């Protein structure tokens, strides 16, 4: 989906950051919450056709390589092609389950910095690279931002 997955448990880290009061639980407008839920659902569903297209393209290229060059460059890449669509479907199901079970929450956090690939680090959640799901695209260090957590994904959202 959108955010980056890291080794340690996202919920645990969010709780720790909240306990240390570097993350403050946020109450957001009904409207913004609905927008978040819609966006989270659609971006997880969007991954499904993309994953099949990627898999089909890569498998076609592999097939042509094997057919014409008798190259057996299959292993890892083919495995990825099989796993990616399965993961995408799993992710979409997990996301809609999370929405149904209200497994999402919002916080006010402070931007620490932005890294090269456009993701942000938030105070207390430094090891996570957090991307913007919608709203404001550019943040500066020290800015306050709304951090949304759904399942183990973290995203930045804003009204504007």
Question: Predicted regions span which residues?
Answer:
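Secondary-structure transition/turn motif
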Residues: 124-128, 159-160
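Cytosolic juxtamembrane N-terminal segments of multi-pass membrane proteins
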Residues: 2-45
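A membrane-cytosol interface segment of integral membrane proteins
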Residues: 139-160
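Short, flexible coil/linker elements and helix-boundary hinge sites characteristic
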Residues: 69-70, 135-136, 155
């Amino acid at each position: 989906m959108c955010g980056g997955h890291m080794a340690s448990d996202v919920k645990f880290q969010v709780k720790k950051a909240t306990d240390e009061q570097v993350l403050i639980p946020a109450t957001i407008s009904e409207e913004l919450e609905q927008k978040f839920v819609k966006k989270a659902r659609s971006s997880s569903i969007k991954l499904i056709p993309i994953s099949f297209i990627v898999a089909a393209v890569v498998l076609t290229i592999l097939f042509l390589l094997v057919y014409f060059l008798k190259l057996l460059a299959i292993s890892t890449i083919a495995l990825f092609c099989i796993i990616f669509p399965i993961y995408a479907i799993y992710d979409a199901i997990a996301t809609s389950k999370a929405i149904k079970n209200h497994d999402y929450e919002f916080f006010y956090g402070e931007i620490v910095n932005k890294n090269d690939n456009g993701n942000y680090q938030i105070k207390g959640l430094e090891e996570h690279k957090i991307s913007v799901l919608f709203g404001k695209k550019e943040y500066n260090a020290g800015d306050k931002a709304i951090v949304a957590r759904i399942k183990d994904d973290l995203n930045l959202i804003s009204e504007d």
